[in-house]
């Protein structure tokens, strides 16, 4: 069980809603993933229409919605988008995204921290997408964010956990849930994040862009469960030298 703010989740796999070929594939893939929390870009949905292609299936599935501020270029943009989302969707939950550079989509750490502090004061439950920067993640925690969402690698790049060393530090020092977001390109990447001790992962492109998104969603579901189970079971430490699992002496004496 994973608790974030006022909600408890059975699944530690959170999902995105972009890049699916159609709403039906999206709905089937989300169901196969077992995910209970989905994020969607405010700029991609019509908040005034409950039968919106993205919003309608999510509402019918009774998904927990995590609107995001993708497209915001600064703190002011993000706060404005958050207020619109809260009014239209009746939720205080928000994935805070501020990435002014359209090429690499790197999150702006300064604007993200400024927006997070303001949004928390306004009563939002803020989950900020950010660099895998241990200092920044600690600052976001200190201003009241309900979780932190450091990137594994650039959004949609499928490069996996390029930031592994820094993720380990963030996980070690965090007092709020750590959700690895962005760049997770395969189920093995998700399992690795969970083995490190991440509380959850958020996956979109790797599922939506797969040849069979529904099967891939199930693969991610199993990978996240396996990775978490491995972490909780206590993985053995890595060592430089070999350690035998069978006796190395006495064999000839035994058989002679």
UniProtKB/Swiss-Prot annotation:
The active site is at 95 (schiff-base intermediate with dxp). InterPro entries: Aldolase_TIM, Thiazole_synthase_ThiG, ThiG. Belongs to the ThiG family. The gene is thiG. This is Thiazole synthase. GO terms for cellular component: 2-iminoacetate synthase complex; cytoplasm. Signal peptide: none annotated. Its EC number is 2.8.1.10. 1-deoxy-D-xylulose 5-phosphate binds at residues 156, 182-183, 204-205. One of its GO terms (molecular function) is thiazole synthase activity. Homotetramer. Forms heterodimers with either ThiH or ThiS. PANTHER family: THIAZOLE SYNTHASE. Catalyzes the rearrangement of 1-deoxy-D-xylulose 5-phosphate (DXP) to produce the thiazole phosphate moiety of thiamine. Sulfur is provided by the thiocarboxylate moiety of the carrier protein ThiS. In vitro, sulfur can be provided by H(2)S. GO terms for biological process: thiamine biosynthetic process; thiamine diphosphate biosynthetic process. Keywords: Cytoplasm, Schiff base, Thiamine biosynthesis, Transferase. Its main location: cytoplasm. It is found in: Cytoplasm. It comes from the Bacteria. It catalyses: [ThiS sulfur-carrier protein]-C-terminal-Gly-aminoethanethioate + 2-iminoacetate + 1-deoxy-D-xylulose 5-phosphate = [ThiS sulfur-carrier protein]-C-terminal Gly-Gly + 2-[(2R,5Z)-2-carboxy-4-methylthiazol-5(2H)-ylidene]ethyl phosphate + 2 H2O + H(+). It holds the Pfam family ThiG. Pathway: Cofactor biosynthesis; thiamine diphosphate biosynthesis. It is an enzyme of class 2 (transferase).
